[in-house]
Swiss-Prot record:
Keywords: DNA damage, DNA repair, DNA-binding, Glycosidase, Hydrolase, Lyase, Metal-binding, Multifunctional enzyme, Zinc, Zinc-finger. A zinc finger (FPG-type) spans 249-283. Its EC number is 3.2.2.23, 4.2.99.18. InterPro entries: DNA_glyclase/AP_lyase_DNA-bd, DNA_glyclase_Znf_dom_DNA_BS, Formamido-pyr_DNA_Glyclase, FPG_cat, MutM-like_N-ter, Ribosomal_uS13-like_H2TH, Znf_DNA_glyclase/AP_lyase, Znf_FPG/IleRS. Binds 1 zinc ion per subunit. SUPFAM superfamilies: Glucocorticoid receptor-like (DNA-binding domain) (SSF57716), N-terminal domain of MutM-like DNA repair proteins (SSF81624), S13-like H2TH domain (SSF46946). This is Formamidopyrimidine-DNA glycosylase. Coiled coil: none annotated. Monomer. It comes from Corynebacterium efficiens (strain DSM 44549 / YS-314 / AJ 12310 / JCM 11189 / NBRC 100395). It holds the Pfam family H2TH. Its cofactor is Zn(2+). Belongs to the FPG family. GO terms for biological process: base-excision repair.
Amino acid sequence: MPELPEVEVVRRGLEEHMVGRTIVSAAVVHPRTARNQAGGGAEIEANLTGLRVGATNRRGKFLWLELDDVAQQAPSGLGLLVHLGMSGQMLVKSPDATLNPHLRARAELDDGNEVWFVDQRTFGYWWLGELVDGVPGRVSHIARDLLDDALDIPALAAVLKTKNTEIKRLLLNQEIVSGIGNIYADEMLWEAGIHPRQKASRISLTRLVALLEAGREVMTRALDQGGTSFDALYVNVNGASGYFSLSLNAYGQAGKPCARCGTPIARETFMNRGSHFCNRCQKVR
């Protein structure tokens, strides 16, 4: 599943191509794309058409378009929420582009370009609704993420310190801190030298702050490299893959020597997914 850096890459691409553009038509091709919309795809099509994209925003793994009322020359109060799910792509295409068999929704812009939502596995979705304090109501419960300037890292570390549960479980909880998935949880824990199963309550505040700062640094590096792509399902708006997978130190490195000490990276099952760590550098204390 695309995590924060991958979604941010897509958001930036949409910002370049969509901000200031009016949506002249919209079509929801597959019903699952509008499964969370009370009025289904028809509601999205009717209400999205004619609105102008004022801004693109993101929180964690969710991105959205802030939509303006063209006639009123003011914000409409609506946002189009996009969740990429496991395989979703937002692609900017020319009107003569060959149709993709996994096209699920599309929006035509007033410059002639189209934005396609391509989703092979159909876990992603679009949702059009009101913004609450600038965030789509459907995801207003999602916590701030590590690249959010408004995130108070010491305060978040203090919250983690109160939890007597495994630190990785907390990092994956989108209502505590958003945008972290399996890849970046493993990478930031390796950077900080903390075992995924270490109880958060037994980690010092200083180390918890260092862990969160490491996560911010890892995600920034990933963003600079276009995100992490393991297959053709994650691409930016132009269809290009990221290459941070070449820089991973823990995730997917089972059996390879730790870049810090040379001990083979271990892999174990945790929360129905793989955890990757160094038994020497990341001891349970």
